[in-house]
Regions:
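Loop-to-transmembrane helix boundary motifs in multi-pass membrane proteins
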Residues: 120-127, 162-170, 275-284, 292, ...
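Extracellular loop-to-transmembrane helix junctions
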Residues: 1-19, 72-102, 111, 330, ...
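Membrane-interface loop-to-helix entry segments
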Residues: 9-27, 129, 145-149, 165-212, ...
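Extracellular/periplasmic helix-exit of transmembrane alpha-helices
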Residues: 99, 209-221, 275-319, 386-393
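Hydrophobic alpha-helical segments and their helix-loop junctions in multi-pass secondary transporters
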Residues: 138-156, 167-168, 180, 199-227, ...
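Hydrophobic, membrane-embedded alpha-helices of multi-pass small-molecule transporters
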Residues: 47-64, 207-215, 225-287, 332-344
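Membrane-interface "cap" regions at the ends of multi-pass membrane proteins
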Residues: 10-66, 268
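Helix-loop-helix module between adjacent transmembrane segments
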Residues: 10-11, 15, 56, 90-106, ...
């Protein structure tokens, strides 16, 4: 329990100390923000700071810090370290700069921002990458809740149309269309802060239930400083990829521009962007602690948690909430596993619309222009979602790549932020160091993971994975990270030389 409290204290201190260093490095000033200057009543709308924070939290969080943290807890309390230091030095930095760089560029989507600092080739790659990723996220966050609602209906004794996934999927997609089309303040700005509060209350209830029940003990890092994963999956870099949103997530960079278009002052960035990420880190830390405390540890392995997760991640959330909060917890869990994914799904589609609008230079003041983008974006999402519901499209393989693409996107954004800071003659190491680290994480995972290149280098017997070839993957990851840093340094020298010429 001491380990948990120390990490919690570090996160809070990190917000006030390192978060302020990050804020001062960027240098917010009194210039007019896009929300004040443009104010189109649709996407550029001034919102109060407390709303900005809660909407940003819900947009970037959803169930990410819960699912990722529970999965990360399979490695044991060592995951506390990554959640804590990853949030302070990588995730918070990433979210802050993705939001503030967007704000300095008229609220542009992350693909456009990246292109301005890394060049047109990377810009086009990011445009395609972002739209595909956002539509995929939005679709999966429609299919998942639809299936959960069906389960709840069946468990309540209902039958007929209400117990079909297709029916609920269509309902959710209709809602997505409306939320993507209308003003951000109409639904997202009014209702989402409530769900953001629910997400926080659920986390507080979980940790309170653990502290007040003598049967639960959060294991200490120093007593369990080992790989406790039941399958022996390597900590590096699988744990760093798996935790995702609980420490750093590239998906956040697609969401931050939404709030960058709604800020009244640049000085709100520290609280809205860095603060929301720290809050998400705290939520992830709590759920990781629950995963470590509530389930049986057998022979130094997290066997009990693995068994709970085998029944499904949603089932694991129900179990944690029921054990720590009783009936109230079950009600909160129902909100969590159904509402939170939907709130991430609709903002994903909204971000896809805005990314396409920036790309194709289609002004979004006119409802006709918004309709031109909403119909194809939601149309693709509907095709994929309905295809999944009818069984002729399978997301299982595609979704395996999400965590990797998520962290790779974060890596690219951090390199873009590094170039931005260099051009502004500011301390670019504050972003270049985590960018280098995430380069190693992404490359190592891509080489080692079975769904990527792992099948080529790992050892298999009778079709089953026997051993990971870390002797090959680890050096490749390190070499790639060093190469990326070298390319960045070369680019800075080239830029300096061109300026002198």
């Amino acid at each position: 329990m001491i380990s948990f409290l120390l990490c919690l204290a570090l996160l809070i201190i990190g917000y006030f100390v390192y978060g302020k260093i990050v804020d001062n490095t960027f240098g917010p000033d009194d210039r007019e923000t896009p929300a004040v200057r443009i104010n189109d009543g649709v996407d550029y709308v001034v919102m109060p700071q407390w709303k900005l924070f809660l909407v940003q939290l819900l947009n970037i969080a959803g169930l990410g810090p819960i699912f990722g943290a529970l999965q990360g807890a399979l490695w044991g309390p060592v995951v506390f370290l990554w959640i804590t230091f990853g949030t302070i030095f990588a995730g918070g930095v990433h979210d802050y700069f993705s939001g503030m760089m967007s704000e300095r560029n008229d609220g542009a989507s992350i693909a456009e921002v990246t292109g301005r600092y890394l060049g047109p080739v990377m810009q086009n790659i990011m445009r395609v990458f972002s739209v595909v990723l956002l539509i995929m996220v939005g679709t999966v966050f429609a299919v998942g809740p639809a299936g959960l609602i069906v389960t709840l209906c069946k468990n309540s004794g209902m039958s007929g149309l209400l117990t079909t996934t297709l029916f609920w999927l269509i309902i959710i997609l209709i809602y997505y269309f409306i939320a993507t089309f209308i003003s951000i303040d109409a639904i997202i700005g009014k209702i989402y802060p409530v769900f953001g509060i629910c997400l926080i209350i659920m986390a507080v209830g979980v940790i309170f239930g653990i502290f007040t029940n003598p049967a639960y003990t959060i294991p200490e890092i120093w007593a369990n400083f080992s790989n406790m994963h039941p399958s022996g999956t390597p900590i590096w870099s699988f744990m760093f990829i798996t935790v995702a949103c609980g420490a750093i997530s590239g998906f956040h960079s697609t969401q931050s521009p939404l709030m960058a278009r709604c800020m009244k002052s640049e000085k709100q960035g520290h609280f809205v962007f860095y603060g929301a990420m720290v809050c998400e880190g705290v939520i992830a830390l709590i759920w990781a602690a629950a995963g470590c405390a509530l389930y049986t540890i057998t022979d130094g392995k997290m066997a009990g948690l693995a068994e709970a997760l085998a029944a499904g991640q949603s089932a694991a959330i129900y179990d944690v909430c029921a054990k720590t909060m009783g009936g109230v917890g079950i009600a909160l869990a129902m909100i969590g596993v159904v509402i939170c994914p939907i709130t991430s799904g609709d903002t994903a589609f909204r971000s896809a619309r805005l990314t396409l609008a920036d790309w194709l230079k289609i002004d979004q003041d006119s409802w006709v222009n918004r309709l031109k983008l909403c119909i194809p974006v939601l149309g693709v999402g509907a095709f994929l979602g309905i295809g999944n519901a009818l069984g002729f499209i399978n997301y299982t393989v595609i979704w395996r790549y999400f965590s990797w693409t998520n962290q790779t996107l974060a890596m690219i954004v951090l390199w873009a932020a590094s170039m931005y800071l260099f051009k502004e003659k500011k301390n670019y190491w504050i972003t270049a160091v985590p960018a280098t680290f995430m380069s190693a994480v992404s490359c190592t995972y891509f080489v080692l993971a079975p769904e990527c290149l792992g099948k080529m280098i790992n050892t298999y017997a009778d079709g089953k994975l026997v051993a990971y070839n870390t002797a090959v993957a680890y050096p490749i990851g390190i070499i790639f990270a060093i190469a990326m840093l070298a390319i960045f340094i070369h680019a800075t020298k080239k830029h300096t030389a061109s300026q002198k010429a």
